[in-house]
Design a protein with these regions (language model features):
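Beta-strand segments within the central parallel beta-sheet cores of soluble alpha/beta enzyme folds
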Residues: 325-328, 509-511, 621
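Helix-rich, typically C-terminal accessory recognition domains appended to large enzymatic cores
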Residues: 382-418, 428-530, 661
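N-terminal, positively charged nucleic-acid-binding surface of large information/translation enzymes
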Residues: 1-201
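Structured secondary-structure scaffolds
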Residues: 1-46, 98-102, 145, 168-408, ...
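Phosphate-backbone binding interfaces of nucleic-acid-interacting proteins
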Residues: 569-703
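A short small-residue
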Residues: 9, 53-59, 85-86, 373-382, ...
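Intrinsic disorder at enzyme termini
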Residues: 508-596
Length: 703
């Protein structure tokens, strides 16, 4: 028996769970249930990520304390996870005494071992709010062209990049106050000290997916940099210990204490139920015991950097064991596109649960998930077809076709022998490959193998035709024999599907009158065995309920402009929106419906390269990262041409975060194929590329 600790990434405590989040938690839960079914001791912990400026500001906006804010969100998260049958052994919060203890312990050990440094950093400071301003919280006039209301890192009009301290007439977007320049000591984790260790660690077989390890190599090639791990008050988080009296209000950056939350949640479980469960913290986290236990992190591919570089380096530097493996997954698209509020495909967990069975989604995700970091697509038509065909039409149908004959004619008792032992043995033997697929996180393969077994059962029933035999006098024993074989196969299918469909399989367990659905139980044949009354195990997916879910997920777009204008208002109260003309047009513009607007997919893109096009004075050629990956998880770039060469030098745009229309049909041009369109704003013949905050990830959509 293996001893395994499993975690999922910690959801941030400032908003609800949606289907994109659930890919990870359902994937992890299925793996945990499968490994438990295979006889291993598996512990699954998680927590809310509950610190940071965003939470502090969200609480202030809601008129509550940060503690109340995170408590309310945690309760909502736990309800959503329970609704989708995600069975944590412990769900905690990073705002806990255990997390504070281990965050400070790790920091102190890193400090003592020479891995912490500090230096003065100058930043703009809001004297009214009493906090330092990140670039997204300060605006002013461009130091080059004088354009007003530009963010603290680049000008949307002329494309110049600069430091926030270079803005003319800056103001805080939080208060409207004029910021002052203020120096502050920042603390850094010296990540380059662990470069050799990390290169070896990330290349160990089985530690990371190959595509992830290859991506991390780019960071090693560029050279690791010291990591800023401190924030100044006011900040919602933990204070950094042992700072000088002159620097009393230094806090850990949220990404330092967030992964420590894995340890803290497990420690909380050990303290509360360790004796009962046979769990000891040091067995899983001390270096001395790392060969006797295993630790697995399930995460999204967008946070690999923190988990595969910072986190193992922190643990190594502080004398703790490092994870056995980190399993990254891709993103979720819906109907082949990024999730969209306007299209009703940005679906919250609660909205789904109000309309549909959670096990539908668990099965559909399982049928799509593999060990790769490739994105998965929730096609709602395919979703309905697959669930109805596989689960209702194939699996449940076996029991519903046979149970009546056993109850009505044989006193609910199965035959004393198995008339087709070779067929049943094939299904039992298939369990070896199914178990291996589960362990390797190749869930889609496991589902295919299970459905192949279901097909064999239905082919057997169709061949024997028990409904016809039942009408022939003297053939009732044969009917009992056929149904006994079919229901034994059904039992195997239930064993195999239990990690994915725990509720349905529990109903099936009661119907079959068996004690266990663990993998080993499949070897015990049901002969001379009494079954219970059959009740419906799963209903077909109702198309109207899917439509109702989508409709309920569509936000009232009439409210969006007011919200956008409010968010972009400066100290004068005037709207600062740049994407549209500053004055209302006097000409008439044809109106379009929301369905027309919803057809356009606007995707956040990172400019990886930008070049002049020889022979085309007006064109620039862009290489964009729009968040797409190939089957191996490598970035799949897009080539886009844009007629803005007269307004920009190529080097001005490299590294920018722009908006690309990604669902335009590819256009063949003289100089190559253009695979999208970069958005620009136009006034008086001047084109300005629309740029976004660099913190927004490639692949996010405007909705």
């Amino acid at each position: 028996m293996r001893k395994i600790l499993v975690t999922s990434a910690l959801p941030y405590a400032n908003g609800p769970i949606h289907l994109g989040h659930l890919v990870e938690y359902i994937q992890t839960d299925i793996w945990v249930r499968a490994m438990k079914s295979l006889g291993h001791q598996v512990t699954y912990v998680c927590a809310d990520d509950a610190h940071g400026t965003a939470i502090m500001l969200k609480a202030e906006a809601n008129g509550v304390t940060p503690e109340q804010q995170i408590a309310d969100v945690k309760a909502s998260h736990e309800k959503d996870f329970a609704g989708f049958l995600v069975d944590f052994d412990n769900y905690y919060s990073t705002h806990s005494p255990e997390n504070e203890h281990y965050s400070q312990l790790i920091y102190n050990r890193l400090y003592e071992n020479g891995h912490i440094s500090h230096k003065a950093v100058e930043q703009l400071y809001d004297p009214e709010k009493g906090l330092f301003l990140a670039d997204r919280f300060v605006k002013g006039e461009c130091p080059k062209c004088g354009a007003k209301d530009q963010y603290g890192d680049n000008c949307e009009v002329c494309g110049t990049t600069y430091n926030a301290t270079e803005l003319k007439n800056p103001y805080s977007t939080l208060s409207g106050a004029t910021p002052v320049l203020k120096s502050s000591i920042h603390y850094f984790f010296n990540l380059p000290n662990f470069s050799e260790f990390l290169q070896n660690w990330t290349r160990k077989e089985g530690r990371l997916q190959t595509s992830i390890a290859n991506k991390l190599q780019e960071w090693f090639d560029a050279g690791l940099a010291n990591w800023d791990i401190s924030r100044d008050a006011p900040y919602f988080g933990f204070k950094i210990p042992n700072t000088p009296a002159s620097e009393p209000d230094k806090y850990f950056y949220v990404w330092l204490d967030a992964p420590v939350g894995y340890m803290a949640s497990f420690k909380n479980l050990c303290d509360q139920q360790g004796a009962q469960l046979g769990l000891h913290f040091d067995d899983y986290w001390s270096k001395e015991n790392h060969n006797n236990t295993e630790v697995y992190h399930f995460i999204g591919k967008d946070i690999v950097y923190f988990h595969a570089l910072f986190w193992p380096a922190m643990l190594e530097g502080a004398g703790f064991r490092t994870p056995t493996a980190i399993n990254a997954h891709g993103f979720l698209t819906v109907n082949g596109e990024k999730m969209s509020k306007s299209r009703g495909t940005f679906i919250k967990a609660d909205t789904y649960l109000q309309n549909l069975d959670p096990e539908y989604l668990r099965y559909y995700f399982a049928s799509k998930l593999s060990a790769s970091v490739e994105d998965i697509n929730l096609d709602l038509e395919d979703f309905m077809q697959k669930v109805n065909s596989d689960l209702v039409g194939k699996v449940v149908n076996i029991a519903s076709r046979c149970a009546g004959f056993i109850h009505k004619n044989h006193g609910s008792k199965l035959a004393l022998t198995i008339s087709e032992p070779a067929l049943l043995q094939q299904i039992i033997d298939a369990g070896e490959d199914i178990a291996a697929a589960y362990e390797a996180r190749e869930f889609s393969k496991a589902m295919r193998l299970i459905m192949a077994c279901a097909d064999k059962a239905n082919e057997y029933i169709d061949d024997k035709k028990p409904w016809a035999l039942n009408k022939v006098e003297g053939q009732q024993a044969e009917v009992q024999a056929v149904c006994t074989v079919a229901l034994n196969i059904f039992r195997q299918l239930v064993v195999y599907l239990a990690p994915v469909l725990p509720l349905m399989c529990e109903k099936a367990r009661i119907f079959l009158n068996v004690d266990s659905l663990d993998f080993d139980s499949r070897h015990a044949l049901l002969v001379g065995h009494t079954i219970n009354a059959f009740t419906p195990l799963m209903q077909r997916v109702d198309k109207d309920k899917v439509a109702a879910m989508v409709d309920a997920s569509k936000e009232d777009l009439n409210k969006q402009p007011a919200i956008a204008n409010q968010a972009a208002t400066g100290p004068s109260g005037a709207s600062k929106t740049k994407a549209a003309a500053s004055e209302q047009s006097t000409g008439e513009t044809a109106l379009i419906g929301i369905d027309d607007f919803a057809k356009v997919t606007m995707t956040v893109a990172k400019v990886l390269a930008c070049n002049n096009v020889e022979g085309a004075d007006k064109l620039l050629q862009f290489t964009l990262d729009v968040g797409e990956t190939d089957a191996q998880g490598n970035v799949k770039t897009r080539n886009v041409f844009s007629g803005i060469a007269k307004f920009y030098n190529p080097e001005q745009l490299v590294g920018k975060t722009v908006v690309c229309v990604t669902n335009l049909a590819p256009r063949k041009m003289k100089f190559g194929i253009s695979e999208g369109m970069i958005l620009s704003a136009e006034k008086a013949g001047q084109l300005t590329v629309v740029t976004l905050d660099d913190h927004i990830p490639a692949g996010a959509t405007l909705a």
